[in-house]
Amino acid sequence: LAWSTMVADQNAWGGATYCSYDLFEEFSNYDDKTLGEKVDDKVRRHNSVASYGESYPELSTDPSDPYVYGVTESAGSQGANVKKYVIGTKKVNGFSEPNNSGINTYMLRLAEVYLNYVDAAMGSDDQTTDPTALKYFNAVRKRAHMPAKDVVTYEDLRHEFRMEFAFEGLYWYQLIRRAYSHQQEVVNYLNNQNRNASYYEASTHSYKLSDSYTAPGPDVDLATAADLVLPIADADQTKNPNLKPDANGNIATVPYEFGEREVDEQNLFK
């Protein structure tokens, strides 16, 4: 993900990897309906997205002369490279190697456990005031220096999940979970993200959606409900014709009857 060899040892393949306009706007100019104001998620934005003028002492061998994105060296063409997981060279941190930052690959973060609890507590409702859910939700926000909330809406949860886990490959699964009960809502959301948009003006170092942008964006197909599920493989349908959907795309289901052939709780681990 590193955008130059000044911030990674020898190899830097992230020069053309940028934060999308939609995510950048959500980090820096989010309309928080619960708080009733526009908010800038400064801490997580700073550590997730490198934008012009952001100072990173941790990327320099001399913290008094920090690496400043776009100043120490030119910013990329989109001016918003991915900062998360970019931790500098071995001279800076003492352990990075070419093609190996030394960062652990997290299988499950505590913040994910907390937000999954909030999701479960909310269920199919659009908000929750469950005390434990609020405790966990606000614990995640406190770490990011964001104000606490006394009610969590689904939009709050979606936003928090996206901010906390940006570039970690988890956000899509949060949307899929929502689509189980609010399919069209998710499809509409996916089709209103200003995809493939240019938004950095290098001459002024400003960030705004290009005047020439038209939705849904260049080389972007509109999402449909079919994009939210993986089809059952042809090989599996051939082996079991009952898995073949009908003309409406539905698969016949029957209730499973538990009987003597199942192992009971007492013998499960014998």
Could you tell me what each predicted segment is?
Residues 1-30, 194, 203:
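Polar, glycine-rich mid-to-C-terminal structural blocks
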Residues 35-270:
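Acidic/polar-rich alpha-helix caps and helix-coil junctions
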